[in-house]
Design a protein with these regions (language model features):
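Short helix-onset patch at the extreme N-terminus, typifying the N->h transition
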Residues: 7, 22-23
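Non-catalytic cap/lid and distal C-terminal segments of serine-dependent acyl enzymes
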Residues: 18-21, 28-340
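Short, low-complexity, Lys/Arg-enriched N-terminal segments of secretory-pathway carbohydrate enzymes
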Residues: 1-12
Length: 340
């Protein structure tokens, strides 16, 4: 090979190596850009933005918002619809609507007029995709494997609701504003930004979630409503839904009487409650609501009205069924109750 030929081969090799290096650099930069973009849109980043009141500097939400919160191996959809009716005569409120077992959360809005009515009355509306949740506090060893993929109420509170306290929801505490430093160096505040009154309503198993959240977090809610709910698993020991969540009664009887039994915890309820059930309900017997109301009234009489602050309104609808027609009608009645 001549000297010229060798020089040509070396030159071609160097040029090819330069092209390869350039391609690698371009690909690496593109991958880093995609990674950065993906990270900025991840659920954790979205939550960080939602929770950072110093960045947003707002009370409530400024516009309709959808975001996702991680739960185990998936992300749970959360939707906030913002009322446009809020003004001097219509104060802002929040309504959390909980779906029943295997019901789409959005059906509160697509199959009833509860959402639109609430929005017209100054309620922001919150929907959470709970899937087949039975609103338990834990994932018990006996729980069916596929049920574990759906959120507990403890997760709902800690990961979804509690983070919104910085925006004024789900809290009874205001935020001091307009600081003024006085002569002795202390800081005084001219005003207080008041919390946004928050209410919770659930249908079917969602009614369980609504009342349990109200019992466990009375500071977060001004009122609760349960439509067609089941509140005492002891009266349904053969119910497959309860067995698949809690385990068989004969094996773990204490669990059926424990923290997931609303009727046995009724003396803990501190907020006003609206109960409604259809007499023709062939899914959950109306006696579940009737017996809960009776237990509440017995507890009130035993404790005295001064020590048990909650009030409960109980409505039995003669031809009411376990369907969206009933939930739509009684959901509006519950809104009336909240505004009394």
């Amino acid at each position: 090979m001549t000297w010229a030929s060798k020089y040509y081969v070396v030159a071609v090799f160097r040029r090819m190596r330069l092209i390869v290096f350039c391609c690698i650099a371009v690909i690496t930069a593109a991958l880093m850009s995609l990674s950065k973009e993906s990270s900025s849109n991840s659920p954790s980043k979205v939550l960080q933005g939602l929770n950072d009141s110093s960045v947003h500097g707002m009370w409530g939400f400024g516009a309709d918002t959808v975001y996702f919160v991680p739960y185990r191996s998936k992300s749970i959809r959360v939707e906030i619809q913002v009322s446009k009716a809020v003004g001097a005569d219509v104060p802002r409120k929040m309504l959390l609507l909980l779906p029943g077992w295997n019901y789409a959360d959005t059906q509160w809005c697509t199959r009833t007029s509860v959402c639109s009515t609430a929005l017209s009355r100054g309620f922001d509306v919150m929907l959470v995709e709970m899937g087949k949740s039975v609103y338990m506090d834990s994932l018990y060893p006996e729980m069916r494997v596929d049920y574990r993929e759906h959120p507990t109420r403890v997760w709902l509170w800690k990961e979804v609701l509690q983070p919104l306290q910085v925006r004024g929801y789900f809290t009874d505490k205001g935020v001091p504003e307009d600081p003024v430093r006085i002569s002795n160096g202390k800081v005084m505040y001219k005003s207080l930004r008041l919390p946004i009154p928050t209410f919770v309503m659930g249908l079917s198993t969602g009614a369980r979630g609504a009342l349990l959240l109200a019992i466990e977090h009375p500071e977060a809610f001004r009122g609760c409503a349960g439509l067609s709910g089941d509140y005492n698993p002891l009266s349904m020991k053969s119910d497959n839904l309860m067995i698949n969540c809690l385990g068989k009664y004969e094996q773990v009887p204490w669990r059926w009487r424990g923290s997931n039994n609303i009727q046995m915890r009724i003396n803990e309820l501190k907020v006003p409650c609206y109960l409604a059930h259809g007499e023709a309900d062939n899914v959950v017997p109306f006696q579940q609501s009737q017996q809960l109301f009776d237990a509440h009234e017995n507890a009130r009489r035993a404790a005295g009205s001064s020590s048990m602050r909650s009030t409960m309104k109980w409505v039995l609808v003669k031809n009411g069924m376990h369907n969206y027609t009933f939930w739509g009608e009684q959901g509006i009645r519950a809104l009336d109750f909240f505004e009394e």
